[in-house]
Amino acid sequence: MPNNKVKENPMSLSPGAKFRLAVKTHHPLQIVGTINPYCAMMAKSIGHQAIYLSGGGIANASYGLPDLGITTLNDVLVDVERITNACDLPLLVDIDTGFGGAFNIARTIKAMEKAGAAAVHMEDQVAQKRCGHRPNKAIVSQQEMVDRVKAAVDARINPEFVIMARTDALAVEGMDSAIERAIACVEAGADMIFPEAMTELKQYEQFSTALRSATGKPVPILANITEFGQTPLYSGEQLAAVNVDMVLYPLSAFRAMNKAAENVYRHLLEHGNQEALLDQMQTRKELYAYLHYHEYEDKLDQLFSQPS
């Protein structure tokens, strides 16, 4: 029999639905960190299907602060809105611990939806959190994390908006606790799971198997492949083989940008001229291409050209 089902048009989908579709159709889905709107535009033009805004990245790049839970909801919203206004790729946003108790979490979720985010991840660290790949992390009780998830799920307007639960329990309480927390979060309504700072490839498969067994359904799992952290830099192929659905590169481009800027600043101070660095720079033409600069110029000419 012919298949008469209408194929979904990604352009007509909500941000959350776009994210879910991307997870469903890519094995695994690459999610790349975009620290600002221009980076998001580049990622889309190059061909990526989903983007990410790191809480640590916001603290570092937008406020000159360490990733220690210092930034606020409003700090994050500024960058979310800038990115979603410039790029329609589904955006996953790091909301740390939710920015407070149940009503604060509800406010966070509603604000993220309104700002155009597709998904958020929220973790089980204490409010005075640390980077997920640093020592001495502390986590809240499993029940408190479950309550956070319930508050988030209850607050969302569009059921397609994605609530992803992150657990940092592996480094604090071990694998059994991390899996138990993940199961409890899914039972509380979390759509996807982010097991942070895994140290062995097989651990992802353990999560996947345990979640499917406990919930009776496949639960999408994210692997955070951040540089210089606790997790080895596994390839997408390796991760797909252990049932990872999403591979996150949260700050890869940001770190490369920072190193390039550092080299330019040092070179200018030492040599007083940048000519030797031109082959390492994006050209004006390349810059303009991502911005569609000439289309703006043409519009100006059309609007304000003088009659001959």
Curated annotation (Swiss-Prot):
Quaternary state and interactors: Homotetramer; dimer of dimers.
Record family assignment: Belongs to the isocitrate lyase/PEP mutase superfamily. Methylisocitrate lyase family.
PANTHER family: CARBOXYVINYL-CARBOXYPHOSPHONATE PHOSPHORYLMUTASE, CHLOROPLASTIC, PHOSPHOENOLPYRUVATE CARBOXYLASE
Reported function: Involved in the catabolism of short chain fatty acids (SCFA) via the 2-methylcitrate cycle I (propionate degradation route). Catalyzes the thermodynamically favored C-C bond cleavage reaction of (2R,3S)-2-methylisocitrate to yield pyruvate and succinate via an alpha-carboxy-carbanion intermediate.
GO molecular function, one term: methylisocitrate lyase activity
Keyword Transmembrane helix recorded: no
Required cofactor names: Mg(2+)
Pfam families tied to this protein: PEP_mutase
UniProt catalytic activity: (2S,3R)-3-hydroxybutane-1,2,3-tricarboxylate = pyruvate + succinate
Keyword match ATP-binding: no
Binding positions (Mg(2+)): 94, 96
Annotated source species: Vibrio cholerae serotype O1 (strain ATCC 39315 / El Tor Inaba N16961)
Keywords noted in UniProt: Lyase, Magnesium, Metal-binding
Protein's UniProt name: 2-methylisocitrate lyase
Chain positions recorded as substrate binding sites: 54-56, 131-132, 166, 196, 224-226, 255, 284
GO biological process: propionate catabolic process, 2-methylcitrate cycle
InterPro entries: ICL/PEPM (IPR039556), Isocitrate_lyase_ph_CS (IPR018523), PrpB (IPR012695), Pyrv/PenolPyrv_kinase-like_dom (IPR015813), Pyrv_kinase-like_dom_sf (IPR040442)
Pathway assigned to this chain's UniProt record: Organic acid metabolism; propanoate degradation
EC number: 4.1.3.30
